[in-house]
């Protein structure tokens, strides 16, 4: 009887961890919390990402452009893709990502597609739902990143592959 109870509890614990791991809202909350622990978001100057000059986005003193530790931590903890975009004019450009192109390289320098997520974050709103990311279907969440003055300066993203 004790073995059955222990087995049942272990199964429930594993099931709960898988349910949590595939919860896009919990995963985006974790990404945003990790970024927030580094410091307040801001844009300062420019940086080259995939051969293109784009605004440099910082959290605290850490420049996020071409820095992959936070997004790779999300992959490790949640088995999810993660990206930080910076706003460049009317576009949002991937400056830190674990999303891979079909060639197997990080998709930095690519833009957020003009889709439902783009429409929501452009208005300062979260988007969670199905989305195509560089040709792959995901259950995703996107949050606008705002500076101290409330201006949208970027977007955080996570996705769980369907």
Report the location of each language-model feature.
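Bacterial N-terminal signal peptides that target proteins for export
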Residues: 1-8
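Conserved beta-strands of PAS-like sensory domains
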Residues: 57-63, 136-162
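Extracytoplasmic/periplasmic sensor domains and loops in membrane signaling proteins
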Residues: 65-79, 96-135
């Amino acid at each position: 009887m004790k073995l059955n109870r222990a087995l049942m509890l272990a199964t429930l614990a594993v099931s709960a961890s898988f349910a949590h791991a595939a919860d896009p809202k919990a995963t985006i909350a974790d990404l945003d919390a990790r970024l927030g622990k580094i410091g307040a978001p801001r844009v300062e100057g420019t940086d080259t990402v995939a051969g293109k000059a784009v605004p440099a986005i910082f959290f605290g003193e850490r420049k996020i452009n071409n820095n992959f530790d936070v997004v790779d931590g999300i992959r490790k903890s949640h088995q999810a893709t993660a990206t930080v975009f910076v706003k460049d004019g009317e576009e949002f450009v991937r400056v830190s990502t674990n999303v891979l192109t079909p060639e197997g390289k990080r998709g930095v320098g690519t833009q957020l597609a003009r889709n439902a997520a783009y429409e929501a974050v452009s208005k300062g709103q979260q988007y969670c739902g199905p989305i195509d990311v560089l040709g792959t279907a995901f259950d995703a969440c996107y949050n606008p990143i705002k500076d101290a003055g409330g201006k949208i300066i970027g977007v955080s993203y996570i996705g769980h592959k369907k």
